[in-house]
UniProtKB/Swiss-Prot annotation:
Family: Belongs to the short-chain dehydrogenases/reductases (SDR) family.
The name this protein goes by in its record: 3-ketodihydrosphingosine reductase
Gene name per UniProt: Kdsr
Motif GXSXG, residue range(s) on this chain: 39-43
Principal location class: endoplasmic reticulum
Intervals, Cytoplasmic compartment: 26-270, 315-332
């Protein structure tokens, strides 16, 4: 009886693997496709542009700094696979004026054709204790990280729906899945992206447009180097419990998931566990993905409790360490 049940389970899993591709999105062909990357002048955004260019795409880079854009353009063009490929640079702040963003997207489409994939990678980070952060910091991060993704997406969505093809990628963060000490402003802006993405996916799925949310861990980029200058001790120690990833590795995974139309894009085993743990009511791309989430949830939640306990211990140790000089002063 037990053997029969095991055989039935194996047969069921095999059936899921066979049926899953039939309900999954058709992969997006990158050769000749027009890919727009915001925040594409450095870091993960630039590496995503390179990865798409290596697969034959036409690239529009969007960022604020013209000098960095031109340097990124030169770096990307080294990876061309044919002489027809083009890298277009547009200098604009995607978080300030929707009409301006819409106009530059129209200009890009006039030159390189309709946008097949939009990668929202423009973003910034700021850390500090909740009561020590300026209120303007919360406004700034919501403007850049959230509205800086809303505006470009709004500018391309109508054409994608009309053509019934497209990919929209939102680059969030593991801090957009798990709230951490020092990231009250940053995490909230990254959590907002997921809510936007889930609602948008439900709207555009009937039009064969698919949304991907990427949750990269700490990545070796200029942005991380700048963030580390002011990062609280507690935040730094918690961050050091996981390895720093290379931007090329992160970019390759994001592009792969976007092509496949996967809603979640995670990096490494920790990223996979975190995405499974926080899946909630998020869309799934395949039956197999949903089954994996159901099967692993209990185990991953158990592991997560140990992580949370470790993080709380780090915060307590730092508090005790900071309190010691005060105790010495009172007894002196």
């Amino acid at each position: 009886m037990l053997l029969l049940a095991a055989a039935g389970l194996v047969a069921f899993v095999l059936l899921l693997y066979m049926v899953s591709p039939l309900i999954s999105p058709k992969p997006l062909a990158l050769p000749g496709a027009h890919v727009v990357v915001t925040g594409g002048s450095s870091g993960i955004g630039k590496c995503i542009a390179i990865e798409c260019y290596k697969q034959g795409a036409f690239i529009t880079l969007v960022a604020r700094n013209e000098d960095k854009l031109l340097q990124a353009k030169k770096d990307i063009e080294k990876h061309s696979i044919n002489d027809k490929q083009v890298v277009l640079c547009i200098s604009v702040d995607v978080s300030q004026d929707y009409n301006q963003v819409e106009n530059v997207i129209k200009q890009a489409q006039e030159k390189l054709g309709p946008v097949d994939m939009l990668v929202n990678c423009a973003g910034t980070s700021m850390s500090g204790k909740f009561e020590e952060l300026e209120v303007s910091s919360f406004e700034k991060l919501m403007s850049i990280n959230y509205l800086g993704s809303v505006y470009p997406s709004r500018a391309v969505i109508t054409t994608m729906k009309e053509r019934r093809v497209g990919r929209i990628v939102f680059v969030s963060s593991q801090a957009g899945q798990l709230g951490l000490f020092g990231f009250t402003a940053y995490s909230s802006s990254k959590f907002a992206i997921r809510g936007l993405a889930e609602a948008l996916q439900m709207e555009v799925k009937p039009y064969n447009v698919y949304v991907t949310v990427a949750y990269p861990p700490d990545t070796d980029t200029p942005g991380l180097a700048e963030e580390n200058k002011t990062k609280p001790l507690e935040t730094r120690l918690i961050s050091e419990t996981t390895a720093i990833c290379k931007p090329e590795q992160v970019a390759k995974q994001i592009v792969k998931d976007a092509i496949q139309g996967n809603f979640n894009s995670s990096i490494g085993s920790d990223g996979y566990m975190l995405s499974s743990l926080t899946c909630g009511m998020a869309p799934v791309t395949s039956i197999t993905e949903g089954l994996q989430q159901v099967v692993t949830m209990g185990l991953f939640r158990t592991i997560a409790l140990f992580y949370l306990g470790s993080f709380d211990n780090i915060v307590r140790r730092c508090m005790v360490q900071k309190a010691k000089p005060e105790v010495v002063d009172k007894t002196a």
